[in-house]
Amino acid sequence: MGHGLIEALHGAGRPVVAVDLRELEAGVRAKCRSAYAGNICDTALLDRLHAQYEVGEIYHLAALLSTRGEFAPETAHQVNVGGTLNVLHLAAEQARSHGQRVKFLFPSSIAAYGLPSLDAKNHAGKVAEDCYSHPHTMYGVNKLAGEELGRYYESHYRKLARDRTPHPIDFRSIRFPGIISSETTPSGGTSDYGPEMIHAAAQGKPYECFVRPDTRIPFMTMPEAIDALLRLAQAPKERLTRTVYNVSSFSPSAADFERLVRQAYPHAAVTFVPDLGRQAIVDSWPAECCDRAARTDWDWK
């Protein structure tokens, strides 16, 4: 998402300061005012950014995803919650220094949901933002914590301090579904079975799908995801009725992915070998999400 977002912001004439774990490719780096290789858990780096730049808008994309997070949950918490706290603090310090609210865009995830059973999922219909908030993964717990931290920094930060800056942050978050990109191969997410199937077929490789054929969760394409993030960023604050929004595009089953892949790549070799752990995670996520609030408040479509 970061590369596509840099492309979109650069195309709109916005100066971008980027931070990634690794050096950016030259073509992406050329679209940034500055770029740093570093870690959001490195407070010295964030202090340096605070000293060097006046920041009006932050897109906080860094995260350790759901599958990887279950192998190292404590590390996931350090990155996903500790890192988010660090970047929120940077935003608040920017607001205090420059006397202007900092807009903070936080990509959350359907992993923040936790339906109690497959039967509950099958009968839930389109799930709204405030339902089933008991995630089954550390990543989901972390995303839920990030949403609440953002709400706190926007409305209640340093509530008892005499020198507090009221409402330093304009926090806006989207609970993204699974995201499909034609540009990058996914890694580390539990919704990756769909895009992995597509990329494997395009490369002529066999693919073992780790969920059942009837498994269904929401997905969207990467261009749709970036469009949603930018639409929310540009929405007038007075129109927003909440800090966290669902967005949806389509909800195919894993069997639908296989059927469409075979239409494009007739010789694709796809088998279904469900992994019980990852299957249980995906079964705890909604089959469909209600995005009525996004459509009403900021014209998502």
What does each model-found stretch correspond to?
Residues 85-138:
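Conserved Rossmann-fold NAD(P)-dependent oxidoreductase catalytic core, especially the SDR/UDP-sugar
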